[in-house]
Regions:
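Pol beta-like nucleotidyltransferase catalytic core
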Residues: 1-128, 132-229
Length: 229
């Protein structure tokens, strides 16, 4: 079974070699974005499956983002520029990660794959994928949903087909003023409370259906069912 999890693999054969375009006939299944297969859902939070299912989450803070310092890919540029724009508008946003860009409310770096402090206490969080590719979405969205945040999100253009749009707010990031007004309105009107039931529903879907192990089980079961003599 092959899961292609990186963007634009087909454009970089020198890096991926035989894995650029593996033959479907040689594997139980090959999951490619360009053939309508989504990324396995993962998370960069420290909590386990059991903890997500059994522990209550209490919100004590308002709005955050967790960013790297990268400023290369389209999404890198959009997310850093948008955070700086929000700061210029006077909208408070706590920034975690790298402070190369001198954020007004920088709160510090976080341990690798452990974004808990920057997500779980917050009602709202913002992030953007590195690229806007159909079926390609990552922890940039799932971390917020698992942490029961209302996530302001840019990236996968057909994300509405994959995750209930009531569980996040999709931004365009081609008109920062318009997106700022959406963010401001959402916080002022407490969309988090309004949408929390949908966020929790999608949290269950991620844990029980969309993440690696449930998906793997379905693929194997389907293969066995269709190849039983």
């Amino acid at each position: 079974i092959v899961f292609q999890m990186e963007p634009y693999i087909e454009r970089n054969p020198k890096q991926w070699h035989d894995w650029t375009n593996p033959d479907n006939k040689e594997f139980v299944k090959v999951c490619k974005h360009r053939e309508g297969e989504y990324n396995n859902n993962e998370w960069h939070l420290s909590k386990t499956y059991s903890q997500f299912n059994n522990e209550s989450i209490v919100k004590t803070k308002t709005f955050s983002t967790v960013l790297s310092s990268n400023y290369r890919d389209p999404g890198h540029v959009k997310r850093i520029d948008f955070v700086k724009f929000l700061e210029s508008k006077g909208l408070p946003i706590h920034v975690y990660g790298n402070n190369r860009w001198d954020y007004k409310e920088y709160k510090g770096s976080l341990p690798y794959h452990c974004k808990d402090e920057g997500i779980i206490p917050y009602k709202y969080t913002f992030n953007a994928e590195n690229h806007d590719i159909p079926y390609y979405y990552t922890e940039k969205l799932t971390d917020g949903i698992l942490g029961e945040c209302l996530t302001f999100y840019w990236g996968c253009p057909n994300i509405r087909e994959l995750i209930d749009p009531r569980a996040y707010v999709q931004l365009d990031l081609s008109n920062f003023e318009k997106d700022y007004e959406v963010v401001k309105k959402a916080i002022e009107e407490d969309w988090h409370t309004q949408r929390l039931p949908y966020i929790r529903e999608q949290k269950k879907r991620i844990l029980n259906d969309l993440q690696f192990f449930p998906r793997l089980e379905k693929i194997i079961s389907n293969f066995i069912e269709n190849h039983t003599l």
